[in-house]
Amino acid sequence: MKTPLDPRHKKRQKTVESLFKIDFHKQPINNYTKIILQKKAFIDKKIETAAPEFSIDKINKVDLAILRLAIFELLVEKTQPPKVIIDEAVELAKEYGGDSSPSFVNGALGNIEYQ
């Protein structure tokens, strides 16, 4: 069960915030975010495939940060079950995104080949 005090949820919140901020200005970032950014080209190609009707530069920056984190966790890190990662991404979209963010994030992640 996710709670606001869950350390994994807190880590994901901080990472989404960091990934979001980096799109606007240079700033110090934590090691986990650096690792994700090293895979940014790979992750962004997966996003383009999963949501072909939206170009990367047109996707809401909060949604983009959430997708980057979730796709990294799904395809690179692989330490949590896909259902957990997708559920957590949808929760983050509810917290940080707009009204359509949860369904957009869920739909895009549903199109990712992670087996």
Regions found by a protein language model. Name each.
Residues M1-P102, G107-Q115:
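N-terminal interaction/assembly modules
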